[in-house]
Design a protein with these regions (language model features):
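Residue-level marker for buried hydrophobic side chains located in beta-strands
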Residues: 36, 65, 89, 170-172, ...
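Metallo-beta-lactamase
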Residues: 6-9, 42, 99-152, 158-230
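Active-site metal-binding motif and surrounding structural segment of the metallo-beta-lactamase
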Residues: 46-94
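Short, electropositive alpha-helical surface patch
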Residues: 226-243
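Divalent metal-coordination and catalytic microenvironments
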Residues: 10, 30, 39, 68, ...
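C-terminal regulatory/interaction regions
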Residues: 246-298
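Conserved beta-strand hairpin/beta-sheet module of binuclear metal-dependent hydrolase folds
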Residues: 2-55, 60, 163-173
């Protein structure tokens, strides 16, 4: 059963844990005259989305908005487009081709999660081009009395964008502002998954988003934080720099990957008073390593 919670004015969410991932994923529904779905997730979540919509008495969707074209955020958009043919699917220009033809998304998902990835995520279907809308940076989508500003936010991925809800001063931030960790979600660590992570662009995006004056951060992995938004963004910037420095030094010094993992884990324990899971470590180190090699620094 879906546990829906109203987290801001007419904004509802539910969280799900996918069998193939360690982190929770958060789906957001905005109940206006026309329904809005932010972060559709993989196709495996479509039945839960439909259950949530039924509870909210939402019969249709006007907009489906994945923040970026990774399977855990956007794998279900094709299935949802079939179910709601009147909906427009908003994607970054850099992600449009992957929405219309998800061949590369399927290949990359299979490479990471194996041949049976559909057992955990469900099928990845194409979105009809007639339903795809590519918003400009800063474009405002009006839904009922609500204004949703689309802001391009690369760094985690080149096709990343966020949604700024002006009515509540909240950012649906995807992974552009890090991943909140810790008991009180006060330790935003960089979402550094390879192969496209670029910490320099990531930091530029964080600075850009800090100027929106957000009061609420609607994370896709970590739920909602309705206080200290400025402080969290500043911490995310600082942690992105510090972890990058530690990982670069450990990689530059050489040694086995186990040694690099140990150094980063020890640093994180001292700095953040918390442990990182093996998946956190692997993805974070790999994301920075791929970036440093791409830049010719390693």
């Amino acid at each position: 059963m879906v546990e829906l919670k109203e987290v801001a004015d007419r904004i509802y969410h539910f969280e799900s844990r996918l069998s193939v991932m360690t982190s929770l994923f958060t789906v957001y529904l905005i109940k206006e005259s026309d329904g809005v779905l932010i972060e559709p997730g993989p196709a495996a979540l479509v039945p839960r989305i439909q259950e949530a919509m039924k509870k909210l008495e939402m019969k249709n969707l006007a907009y489906i908005m994945p923040t970026h074209i990774h399977v855990d955020h956007a794998g279900g958009m094709g299935k949802l487009a079939q179910l709601y043919p009147g909906a427009r699917v908003l994607v970054h220009a850099a992600g449009m081709k992957h929405a219309a033809d998800p061949t590369r998304l399927i290949e990359s998902t299979r490479k990471v999660f194996g041949e049976d990835f559909e057992a955990g995520f469900g099928p990845i279907l194409p979105v009809p081009e007639s339903q795809i809308k590519v918003p400009q940076d800063g474009e405002v989508i009006k839904v009922g009395s609500r204004e949703l500003q689309i802001v391009h936010a690369p760094g985690h991925a080149p096709h990343h964008m966020v949604v700024f809800d002006r009515s509540v001063n909240g950012i649906f931030c995807g992974e552009a502002l890090g991943l909140p960790e810790g008991e009180h979600k006060q330790i935003p660590l960089p979402a550094a998954a390879p192969p496209s992570f670029d910490p320099e662009i990531y930091l530029e995006t964080m600075e850009k988003l800090s100027k929106l004056g957000a009061r609420i951060l609607f994370y896709s992995h970590g739920g909602v934080v309705g206080h200290n938004a400025d402080s969290l963004i500043s911490q995310a910037e600082e942690n992105t720099r510090l972890l990058g420095d530690v990982i670069f030094k450990a990689l530059k010094d050489g040694g086995a990957i186990q040694d690099v993992n140990r150094k980063v884990k020890e640093y994180a324990a001292r700095r953040f008073d918390m442990g990182l899971t093996e998946m956190d470590l692997t993805l974070t180190i790999s994301g920075y390593e791929v970036y440093y090699k791409r830049k010719g620094l390693l």
